[in-house]
Amino acid sequence: MSDGEEKPDGFSFAGIAAGLKDSNKKDLALILAPENSICSGLFTQSIVRASCVDICEQRIKKSSGLIRAILINSGQANACTGDYGIQHTLFATKEVSQLLGINEEEVLMCSTGVIGIPIQIKNLIDNLPNLVKELKTNSLQNAAEAILTTDLVDKKITIETFIEGRKVKISGFAKGSGMIYPNMATMLAFLTCDVGVDKEEWDKMISIAVKKSFNAISVDGETSTNDAFIGINSGKKIDKKFLSKIQSGIDIVCQSLAKNIARDGEGANCLLEVLVEGAKSNSDAIKIAKSICNSSLVKTAINGCDPNWGRIISAAGNSGIDFKLDFLDLYIGDFQILKKGKLNKYDSKKVANYMQTRMNGKYLVEDIVSISLHLNSGSEKGTAWGCDLSKKYVEINSEYTT
Amino acid sequence: MSDGEEKPDGFSFAGIAAGLKDSNKKDLALILAPENSICSGLFTQSIVRASCVDICEQRIKKSSGLIRAILINSGQANACTGDYGIQHTLFATKEVSQLLGINEEEVLMCSTGVIGIPIQIKNLIDNLPNLVKELKTNSLQNAAEAILTTDLVDKKITIETFIEGRKVKISGFAKGSGMIYPNMATMLAFLTCDVGVDKEEWDKMISIAVKKSFNAISVDGETSTNDAFIGINSGKKIDKKFLSKIQSGIDIVCQSLAKNIARDGEGANCLLEVLVEGAKSNSDAIKIAKSICNSSLVKTAINGCDPNWGRIISAAGNSGIDFKLDFLDLYIGDFQILKKGKLNKYDSKKVANYMQTRMNGKYLVEDIVSISLHLNSGSEKGTAWGCDLSKKYVEINSEYTT
């Protein structure tokens, strides 16, 4: 399968079935970046990390971001696998480097899937020549499929714009919260951009984008052993005054992927979008919004189409960020629930009906439940995303699998 | 109804139905402490607090803990009720003080129930004379019932010991995580002790006990607008060398109530008890244990009797506390799962069977799923408690109530 859209110049992608998953679905992906590409990565903050994550960090640092290839496997997360973890990562990246004729230090590896079971290394190695052969500029779709675990849909986006007559493209793909035993949600996301940006600047831009996207979503408040976001740029540089335009593009790609992940959370029926305005800082706003998205009580209320504003305000109150109850304006959809902290007259049946409609709306178009909270204490704002908490979530995650 | 057990000397209790709840169940409680009693209180850290909580804090501080009475109502939480909040609290505590012939500053008030709806103040005030008339030394049971919302069982405990021939008693009662629309879990707990302890010492002792009990439980990670723990002591003082014995007693009472609350979490089938040993500090150990108790993925795995150790380790890794994966010993029940970070041979069917048995075991006797994690990095330990996450939890909290 190939994509219709034009991808960032110089990058090629591959995704194949290498027999790592029992399902025989695609499970091995590769991204090849042009020479002199600049790479930044942000990785799980968990103490328990897969060793492939450590190697990613080390190699990006050591090479000052001069990374050429990223190998990604699904099926086994290669975490908590003792000495196998690092051995298999080193072995696989070395093989890839030899096939591509590059330095092994220029190859990264990300894994997602079952924890505690060694990677199916023989199948992986045997299929590397085939994987490399499949590298094409228009195979991003295959790569996006190959990194999925039990995600219900693939998650990818390409955007383009013209800057001084030059066509500029940014592509991203990601996987979200699939579950395989014994496992947890893992987030992997990759971004490519065909405008050259210096390492230091790129680090900043990636970090800004992640703060407003992947770090602003929550499916179930869990951080995985393998979470990773890697962004690579390559190509002719651009006048500094246009960098803000590139930043906007990266933000759009990251937010789109992040929303896709939240919406595809286990058992979810809607995307929950929480906007907090009137905060003292953007990060305060995001913290409050995230606290609301993270609340089991808010998430179950949404699942039940119950405009339970007390839970929303209480979750905001638990964010650790100071605000005045008497200043709050709260909206669910277009319905104002609180006005300067006091209950506004609203038709709770209409609000419930709004939620009900959204719970059954068209995927990522009309299935967004919006909550907005104005603190009236500053001029900054921020958004976070989540999903409802359903019986299906419990079912998926409590399935008897041993 | 009166209790069989002997309660702390000098304290009396009452609990009646005052028409605050639609169910006509008991909904108004009173604790009367002897003159010169010493009171300490710990309250919700949420930014959104009921004004009765503010008044509790102010009065305890202003009087240096010289508190005589605590009025507690269930039915309405008196939070997010605008000016009514403080007016009703002041009115009710003033009335109580006049009926008891004490200073209004010596009366505290705690509320739990529906948020955003004013307290049924007329019913409350009309019933105060009756409440005061009901005060008896052996009516703790009535008080314990009157503070419940949708708790399935009442939660109370009295312990006694002899110190140099003197009989010493400590009693406590609490309510946990009931739900009424629009509402969230509220925890209220009260402790009385008939040994006199100075304010400064008592503050410390209460704070130590709470850290190891109420602050170490999680039903769904939510903090309420009204959470409160209040401990009062009164009576002859005791040689300082015996204070550690009193501390142990307070710890036992608080932990018993805390475990009761965790076990009675919505939809729960078991008590989850997580012991973390070999930590650098007690608070590190509790943080890790709590992170495990808080994990939706661990809680659903337990609900499914799935010995999903990857989720346990991952939750530990998200606690923010540093540890070495290679040092970890992990047990579920008596089954060793990890040995110095490596998978131990165990019969996963037997582990699943252990969990299954516990999920159907006798209430708070044989229904405890134990997880223990040894970090092998220090000599401190700590325990936290939670419960499984069931479809019933989602059902209870997503019920369509508007």
Swiss-Prot record, chains A, B:
The pathway entry for this protein reads as: Amino-acid biosynthesis; L-arginine biosynthesis; L-ornithine and N-acetyl-L-glutamate from L-glutamate and N(2)-acetyl-L-ornithine (cyclic): step 1/1; Amino-acid biosynthesis; L-arginine biosynthesis; N(2)-acetyl-L-ornithine from L-glutamate: step 1/4
Q: Can you state which reaction this protein catalyses?
A: N(2)-acetyl-L-ornithine + L-glutamate = N-acetyl-L-glutamate + L-ornithine; L-glutamate + acetyl-CoA = N-acetyl-L-glutamate + CoA + H(+)
Annotated active site residues, numbered on this chain, are T186
* E.C. no: 2.3.1.35, 2.3.1.1
Which cellular component terms (GO) are annotated to the entry? cytoplasm
Recorded GO MF terms = glutamate N-acetyltransferase activity; L-glutamate N-acetyltransferase activity
- InterPro entries, A to Z: Arg_biosynth_ArgJ, ArgJ-like_dom_sf, ArgJ_beta_C
Physiological role: Catalyzes two activities which are involved in the cyclic version of arginine biosynthesis: the synthesis of N-acetylglutamate from glutamate and acetyl-CoA as the acetyl donor, and of ornithine by transacetylation between N(2)-acetylornithine and glutamate.
Q: Which family does it belong to?
A: Belongs to the ArgJ family.
HAMAP family, per the entry: ArgJ
Protein name per Swiss-Prot or TrEMBL:
Arginine biosynthesis bifunctional protein ArgJ
The taxonomic lineage of its organism, from the top, reads: Bacteria, Bacillati, Cyanobacteriota, Cyanophyceae, Synechococcales
